[in-house]
Design a protein with these regions (language model features):
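Hydrophobic packing and interface segments
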Residues: 1-738
Length: 738
């Protein structure tokens, strides 16, 4: 099978994304970095961020070498795994790490330049920050599609399988590089989350509550570590998370498409089904770039106007992609192109609804957060209670939206043939529709990730302006940019969680295809079904596999798997919350020590030891991230070896359902506490320094690990467990107790 000409649109779009990202980076570097003091502060943050990243990558490299050797043994020693897996695993991790490095480098160079641009105008500051954030967005989608293109070309050339099984083998092999991306994302999210919140909690508790000094005050020893943490967690961490979702959704959908049309007379349609998600992602890149250029605002713009400025770019790109999808699938000539286009639209709309719901429950422009701020009048306890309650209620809309998106995407893909909804062919097409809905949701990632990466850049710009002593007009502009960044960051977290849920569901369906390959690898060509009939493994449907492995709710191994999966979300959150607590204790003690021992800090005559706080956060994050991160790799392997395929299916379902709901709750509760504090700081309920303010600072401090460590890391937990299960499918088939 030759590679069709239309495929080359995919690597071409990847190259365009990287070229535009490079142009934005060069444009940002040409901006003036400001006064000597602004440059000095930016250099402190830059050195701290890069020191952390170097240390993290050293640890991750050791883990990758060990896992790659293990996969090499399974492939070449035990013979239970595809021989390409070790190499695919390494490239997935490499490209994910590369995206994080470029994003972090850009963000740390952009903050002072954004603050300096804000000295000219609000619009100038917005453009510098947003286009610097766009570097992260475009690098993620560019490197993601480049990696996918590379592996498709290599495997198409070297996989020596004929007939419809060739594309099945190619797509299931490509899917395994997602584990490399997932593993790298796991360490980036968990380590970055622990780092940033240890610094943030330490800076807030001692600086704001005990010493009574403002946020980002240069007298606070933890303030540089806090600024470094914004980049570590919200740029490198978020980028790795969404890189994993982006690649995972495209690859899982391609694998489902290859399986749905794996018949001798359907090979042409099979190729179209594999190419469709790649082409939608490729066109999405180009249209996202157009949206990025549309973002601008006027001087003195209100928060609603600033949000509208970003919304113009995102919504315009979404509308263009929605229209382009119909054209792509029609010209491709794929079966039921109209229904599949509607599945893509379903994903796009679901992403927008989840983003809007997140904004409603976390922005102080709306009642839920206003009520939390009002509850501060009776102390910190009521702030905590109100935030927990609001976070729990906020799960309803995202869960119902994802549920509606799943059923609509499924029905659109099968042409609303509800009478035969569970027929084998319709089930394959329906699952393909769900996968392509996930691709639709992530097709705007080039610009949606730009709005998210913009947040920490604007936050650091505000910190730089505060520490550099810039005038009140500049601080007013950077505060406006920072407030916008807080809202986009919260919305971005909701988007990341929703996309993770749809991607994990597509990966769950793809797991069955890996089981098929695992059976064939182990020389099993026939399934003896419980009803007394037999079916060739190559031709078996998903329903045949469900019956063969007895994946029903009456099977105790499935139930055990569901309980373990549900428990994993809470166990993981507990471990990461405690990790932040321990690291924050070290930071609090260090800041107190410096206030006590270094004379003149609070009067501005002494200089804090910023480097010591950066070092404490770095060491704490590296030490604390190992166990939670490795847990997500070890548990799926152990469940597979003990309870087999049925147990793993239960594990993935339990982890997906509990992880999704818990992630929404934690992200929204944390975001609401943060913005309730900001509302009080704007002068409501007594303003800064009041008892209400101190109560909201406590709420914000509790919410920090909720929204920036445990909550976002659950996205990767549910995807990584799926990816590990997929990669280890051959071992699970060959060796299990039950």
């Amino acid at each position: 099978m030759n590679i069709p000409l239309i495929f080359w649109i995919v690597p071409a779009a990847a190259v365009i994304a990287l070229a535009v990202a490079w142009a934005f980076y060069r444009s940002m570097k040409r901006e003036d970095e400001g006064t000597p003091r602004m440059r000095e502060i930016a250099e402190h943050v830059r050195k701290g961020a890069m020191a952390y990243l170097r240390q993290q990558y050293k640890v991750v490299l050791i883990v990758f070498i060990i896992l790659a050797l293990f996969f090499a043994y399974l492939a070449y020693g035990a013979g239970v795994q595809n021989p390409w897996v070790p190499f695919a695993f390494l490239t997935g991790g490499f490209f994910s790490g590369l995206a994080g490095y470029f994003g972090m480098k850009t963000a740390t160079y952009a903050s002072a330049r954004t603050a300096n641009a804000a000295r000219q105008s609000l619009d100038r500051g917005l453009k510098v920050a947003f286009r610097s954030g766009a570097v992260m967005g475009l690098v993620v989608v560019g490197l993601g599609l480049l990696d996918i293109s590379f592996w498709y070309i290599i495997l198409e050339r070297f996989v020596e399988v004929s007939g419809p099984q060739k594309l099945v083998v190619i797509t299931t092999t490509m899917l395994t590089f997602g584990m490399g991306a997932s593993t790298q994302a796991r360490f980036a999210r968990v380590g970055g989350g622990i780092y940033t919140k240890a610094a943030d909690v330490g800076a807030d508790l001692v600086g704001k509550v005990e010493a009574g000094i403002p946020e980002d005050d240069p007298r606070n020893p933890a303030t540089i570590a806090d600024n470094v943490g914004d980049n570590v967690g919200d740029v490198a961490g978020m980028g790795a998370d969404l890189y994993e979702s982006y690649c995972g959704s495209v690859l899982a959908t391609a694998a489902l498409g290859a399986a749905a049309f794996a018949t001798a007379d359907g090979m042409a349609m099979q190729l179209k089904a594999v190419l469709a998600p790649m082409l939608i992602a490729a066109v999405g890149i180009v249209l996202s770039i157009i949206g990025i250029f549309l973002v601008r605002t006027r001087e003195g713009a209100s928060m609603r106007e600033l949000l509208r400025s970003l919304g113009v770019g995102v919504n315009f790109s979404s509308l263009l992609i929605a229209g382009a999808t119909f054209g792509i699938l029609y010209l491709l000539g794929i079966q039921n192109w109209l229904g599949l286009s509607c599945s893509v639209i379903t994903g796009l709309v679901a992403g927008i609804i989840i983003g809007q719901a997140t904004e409603y429950y976390t922005s102080h422009s709306y009642k839920p957060t206003q009520k939390i701020a009002g509850s501060a009048q009776t102390g910190p306890a009521t702030v905590i209670i109100a935030g927990v309650g609001s976070g729990m209620i906020s799960t309803a809309i995202p869960v119902l939206t994802i549920g509606a998106a799943i059923i609509l995407a499924y029905l659109c893909a099968i042409g609303f043939d509800m009478e035969n909804m569970m027929a084998p062919m319709n089930m394959s097409l329906g699952l393909y529709g769900i996968g392509i809905a996930a691709v639709g949701m992530l097709s705007t990632l080039g610009i949606t990730l730009a709005t998210d990466a913009y947040g920490p850049i604007a936050d650091n710009a505000g910190g730089n302006a505060e520490m550099s002593g810039l005038g009140p007009e500049v601080r007013k502009r950077t505060d406006a940019l920072d407030a916008l960044g807080n809202t986009t960051a919260a919305t971005g977290k909701g988007f990341a969680i929703g996309s993770a849920a749809l991607t994990a569901l597509a990966l769950l369906a793809s797991y069955i295809e890996e089981i098929r390959i695992g059976l064939l690898h182990n020389g099993i060509t026939m399934l003896d079904l419980p009803n007394g009939t037999s079916q060739l493994v190559e031709k078996a449907s998903i329903l045949d596999f469900m019956e063969y492995y007895q994946v029903t709710l009456m099977n105790p191994t499935v139930l055990i798997g569901i309980f373990i999966g549900a428990m994993m979300s809470f166990l993981f959150c507990g471990l990461t919350m405690n990790a932040v607590g321990r690291a924050a204790e070290s930071m609090v003690n260090e800041v107190r020590r410096q206030f006590r021992e270094i004379k003149g800090i609070l009067t501005g005559e002494g200089t804090p030891d910023y480097a010591r706080c950066v070092e404490i956060s770095t060491r704490g994050a590296q030490r604390e991230m190992m166990f939670p991160s490795l847990l997500a790799i070890v548990v799926p392997v152990a469940v597979g070896l003990v309870f087999g395929v049925a147990g793993v299916m239960g594990l993935l379902v339990g982890g997906l359902s509990s992880g999704f709901v818990l992630a929404v709750f934690m992200a929204n509760a944390g975001g609401a506490w943060d913005n309730a504090k900001k509302m009080v700081e704007e002068g409501h309920f007594g303003g800064k320094g009041s008892e209400c303010h101190k109560a909201t600072v406590v709420g914000d401090t509790v919410g920090d690990p909720f929204k920036d460590t445990s909550g976002p890391s659950l996205n990767i937990l549910i995807k990584l467990m799926s990816m590990v299960s997929i990669v280890m499918a051959g071992l699970t088939v060959a060796c299990h107790l039950f």
